[in-house]
Swiss-Prot record:
It is an enzyme of class 2 (transferase). Its EC number is 2.4.99.17. It catalyses: 7-aminomethyl-7-carbaguanosine(34) in tRNA + S-adenosyl-L-methionine = epoxyqueuosine(34) in tRNA + adenine + L-methionine + 2 H(+). Pfam families: Queuosine_synth. The gene is queA. This is S-adenosylmethionine:tRNA ribosyltransferase-isomerase. One of its GO terms (cellular component) is cytoplasm. Keywords: Cytoplasm, Queuosine biosynthesis, S-adenosyl-L-methionine, Transferase. Its main location: cytoplasm. GO terms for biological process: queuosine biosynthetic process; tRNA wobble guanine modification. Pathway: tRNA modification; tRNA-queuosine biosynthesis.
Length: 337
């Protein structure tokens, strides 16, 4: 298939620039693959469409304030986006500067703190901080909002560009399907008899990388680190053995589960994945998916197309546009069953 097969015209005013006042105020578009029927609801109603014994799998990765601003010894401005923390003091980052940096260059930050460039690794730079990098980011870092949110980060983003169950620090973009859940929704889901389990996948900046090749099969996915625990594997197997559904909360949870089952059986693992799911893929674990509405021609639209069918996906997105759903990270959600 070609990239343009996944194009749709999205009015710019449907790209959400801010979150709604309350997480669960988001709208929810439900699509049933068997009946091919749509339903329009509020996200707070989602428990009504889940069944006792269903297993929701959520990504508990926590967004780090990964954007830093500094300057070189010459005074030139430098902007960093931390891609991956590799040690207590070391990390890989994308760096924007008027002139490319080289090994042993220093980047000076506020409060007398500094970073040293150790080496270049392809498009990234390996750097060393003058103190624990997570502490430094928490002191000086900014929330790395996606490129389609056309504003600077604000104080509200520290809370709202984060799921309420985030635990494991490491993502530079939020697993956005989880942003709609608040404590009341989680309580209603548990009261319904639905089980919840967690995977960890640290979302990298590569999630925003566009598909540049015409044949989608030629696209090379970015790599992200994930963990599927023995407890999660046991929960999935228990649900499957009872004939219950496994529903991924977000494409990151789905990609983690499918990566861990690439050999045909779900196994515990902790490693990188560059799995690319597009039409023709045979799903091994997931029976349902909760996800936001994604960019035209993106790998995430291709994943949704693989899950519900290409024509069905394009029709679903047209339905969302016609009904004025909000798109992307701070937008509305869909439940695909």
């Amino acid at each position: 298939m070609n990239k343009q097969d996944f194009y749709f015209d999205l009015p710019s005013e449907l790209i959400a620039q801010y979150p709604l006042a309350n997480r669960s105020d988001s709208r929810l578009l439900i699509y049933n693959r068997q009946t091919e029927e749509y339903g329009h609801y509020q996200f707070r109603e989602i428990a009504d469409f889940l069944q006792p014994g269903d297993l929701l799998v959520m990504n508990d990765s926590k967004v780090i304030p990964a954007r830093l601003y500094g300057h070189k010894a010459t005074g030139g401005k430098v902007e960093l986006l931390v891609e991956r923390i590799t040690g207590d003091f070391t990390f890989l980052a994308h760096i924007k500067a008027s002139k490319s940096l080289k090994s042993n260059d220093f980047i000076y930050l506020d409060a007398g703190k500094r970073l040293e460039v150790l080496e270049r690794q392809d498009d990234l730079f390996l750097c060393k901080a003058s103190e624990n990098i997570l502490d430094l980011l928490n002191d000086l870092g900014h929330i790395p909002l996606p490129p389609y949110i056309a504003r600077e980060d604000e104080s509200l983003d520290k809370e709202r560009y984060q799921t309420v169950y985030a635990k494991c620090a490491g993502s530079v973009a939020a697993p956005t399907a989880g942003l709609h859940f608040d404590d009341a929704v989680l309580s209603s889901i548990r009261a319904r008899g639905v089980n919840i389990a967690y995977v960890t996948l640290h979302v990298g900046a590569g999630t925003f990388r566009p598909v540049r090749c015409e044949r989608i099969q030629d696209h090379k996915m970015h790599s992200e680190w994930f963990t599927v625990s023995p407890d999660l594997c046991a929960a999935v197997k228990a649900a499957k053995s009872m004939g219950n559904r496994v529903i991924a909360v977000g494409t990151t949870a789905l990609r983690s589960l499918e990566s861990a089952a690439m050999g045909g059986e779900l196994i515990p693992c902790s490693r990188d994945t560059d799995i690319f799911i597009y039409p023709g893929y045979q799903f091994k674990v997931c029976d349902g998916l909760i996800t936001n509405f994604h960019l035209p021609e993106s790998t995430l639209v291709m994943l949704v197309s693989a899950f519900i069918g290409h024509q069905e996906c394009m029709a679903l997105y047209q339905e969302a546009i016609d009904k004025r759903y909000r798109f992307f990270s701070y937008g509305d959600a869909s439940l695909l069953l």
